[in-house]
Structure formats: C-alpha cells, structure tokens
Amino acid sequence: LELKNVEKIEDLDHEHTARLVLDMFHRIIIHYALWFNEVKHQMGMEKALDILKKASERSYGIQMKRLSGALGFDMKDGIPLPLLKQSKESLKKLMDLVAVNWLANDGVWFQAVEFTHGMNDAKRCNDSCWAQFSPFEAQAIKNFLNLSEEPGLEGLKKALNFRVYACINTQSIVDEETDSFVFQMNECRVQSARKRKGLDDYPCKSGGLVEYTYFAEAIDPRIRTQCIGCPPDDHPEEWFCAWRFTLE
C-alpha cells in the first residue's frame, strides 16, 4: 500500500491498520509520561509521585477493564495477542477503544491534580502537557505516513485525520483559499457529554490554542493557526471549536 495515497484511517490495508494500532499504544505511553513530567516540574517530585500512584492505579483499572472485555482475555502477566490475526474491522474497533482509553487517561491525570490541588493547577499542567504532546503526536504521524519535512496544508489535513482524537470525535474540513482551510470539531466527546448533562461547555480554549498551534507548526513550521471560536467562546450548533490554518 502506498501511504502517500492514503487520506484516512479507513483507507489503510490490514497490515498498516495493525501498525497504526501499535503506534497509538506508543502515543498513549508518551502522553502518560509527559503528564508525570509536567506534574513533577510544576509541583516537585514528592507530590508528583503521590499523584502518580493515584493516577496509575485508576488508569490501569480503567484501561485493562476495557481491553480485557474487548479481547476476551484474563489479566495475568500480560497476554500477547497477534494483531494480524484480527480482522481489519476488529483492529479498527480496538483502535477506537485505545483512543477512548487515551482520553480517559487524560481525564484521570487532570482529576488527580484537580481533586488534590485545585482546578488552576490542573489547567496549568494540562496546557503544559499539550505543549509537549502535540509536537510528539505530529511527529509520530509524520513518521507513520512518511510525510516530508514541509508537507504544507495537504499534509496537515491528512495528519489531522490520524490524531488519536480522530477516532473519538467527529471533525470536518472546509476549504477556503489555496493558502488556508478551516478545521471544525463538530462532535466533541467531552463537550457533548457535558451538553447531555445540561452543563456549560468546558472552557478549553487555552489548551486548544497550545494543542493546535503546536501540532500545525510541528507538521510544517510555515503554517499559522488562528482560533475562530472555542469554549468559552460562543459557537454555532454545528461545531464546538473551529481553527483556521494558513500557509505563510
């Protein structure tokens, strides 16, 4: 399969779908490590180790429960299951599950800090973590797809379809001029859940500015990011946040 001709996850063949599952496991491990590193940086080793214990115990239970239920294995020293014996549909289902576990892991870390040290410290750690995870994920995707060093807006469009979030949320792209496009998050798992509960949007703009700016620049340093709207900003019903990417 020529990956340069692949535009979205569903276009991958069997082998590369399996490779992407493994790559997403790698991403969640790095994200976990970056959370610990930032908590250590912000609060010191002692508090970080205490929070790590709480977060790791909860995170381990959440993730292993989902994985063991989906794959039908008992928890015992880890059980290797050959991914290539799974159908492509099973691999995609597992990939989506890993993505949800990644988001749950993010929430576990956020709440572990919030419940012990307050919302402000949790948001500081969250935004700092994204400043490191976004460039990492961008580089991981560039490596997976064999993108060039400066793949331009078309490279960014493709890369956005391979983020972990692409397995969780519903997103779309609106082309503008030849040197820009708008990326919309039409359904956000976190914000949609809050909406169902009658809660206000979670104010994620500070994190989003870091997340999308750093991701785009890591894909191609010539790309600039503009926030069209992101909570707590008002937004239309069709999207929760929207971002304009321009090639300079």
PLM feature spans:
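N-terminal accessory segment detector
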Residues: 1-181, 189-191, 195-203, 207, ...
